[in-house]
């Protein structure tokens, strides 16, 4: 079969150009399909943009559900005797605090030992056991030692290996002492402070080692035995608004509730002059410190601002996707129209979201966004009234919580989060359903394009055959005509 470029060579007719025009006309059958593909792909992109904006609002709504974590408190300035912090249970208030005593961990010291590797137990005993008992521990520490494990080093390592409530260390008194000689001492220190960590030590199965380590506590901060108490166990003592408080540790977690006090030092005293029997006398008085706990509205305010910003971004996305640009009568639709103009899914999401946001909540004083301090502008976006919002956060935090989270019985406006979650569900959500339908339509269009191309190719092949035969026929007629003309001359 002749190529397109050679068509008409025999007849002198411009059949190649005619065939090109026929092919261009056939290709126009693809244009409606291509336009539909472009439109549906734009819709997919539009739904992707919409999903991104909805995800941001969903994330911001999820943060508002964590009201208790956001509804925080803060404390005033620096304090000499304690470092304060608060959790979600703290309530605003003023507290007068005096630190009377810091909690301390007990520390015991052995008698002098010559050399840290010298075996201190009776040989031939096989195994002996060091038992350390503390009132606050469920089980006593039991350290078993063999005959060759009774040096200070071995005892220290064996105790520390147990990882109980006791630390063991060695103090070398002689600067030039060796491991075999030189004054050394074993130090046992409770890891925890307070009187419930007072140690009682007993060595079973080795009287010689017992002469070095045995210690019996009297339960009152003292004791007797081979070891000497260098630091007595003590509980933390303080007063809060004049109420005496005693704890095992310097971290006071429940007085007042929701406030953590890390005690640093005992309160200083000052001399004040008072009248006693008509005479001025100087008496010592502790310098108390005032802890002021106030509500910290900034985290919640920031979360609300992020939520409003996310909503406004979504509103901008809605406007962009549904944009309509008028055209003259008979003109084609503008290319500037939104990708989801007239789309029912977009309208449905926008309508449901608006209903959720602006429906009145069952909260006495703060039933609407406007009463909360968030108003809707003419363009549909939201605007925060800082003064009104801050006043509500400071004075009506429970109502703000009920507005966003509900009161435990009735839902708050974070039901918007549930709507967004359903909308964005990857399997059955509104957007997933819409995009699934678009993808199915695109696959159908792809098959239609392939079939149309096959039909066009078949049609063009038929035209080529017909044009080739026509070229041959005209060429033959031309040759016959030329021969007859020569005969008739």
From Swiss-Prot:
Keyword Coiled coil carried by entry: yes
Secreted keyword on record: yes
Annotated keywords: Bacterial flagellum, Coiled coil, Secreted
Region (Disordered): 70-92
Highest taxon above the source species: Bacteria
Bias (Polar residues) ranges: 82-91
Coiled coil feature spans: 430-480
Basic and acidic residues bias: start-end ranges: 70-81
Subcellular location: Secreted; Bacterial flagellum
GO cellular component, one term: bacterial-type flagellum filament cap
Family: Belongs to the FliD family.
PANTHER family: FLAGELLAR CAP/ASSEMBLY PROTEIN FLID (PTHR30288), FLAGELLAR HOOK-ASSOCIATED PROTEIN 2 (PTHR30288:SF0)
Role played: Required for the morphogenesis and for the elongation of the flagellar filament by facilitating polymerization of the flagellin monomers at the tip of growing filament. Forms a capping structure, which prevents flagellin subunits (transported through the central channel of the flagellum) from leaking out without polymerization at the distal end.
Protein name (database record): Flagellar hook-associated protein 2
Organism: Xenorhabdus nematophila
Protein's gene: fliD
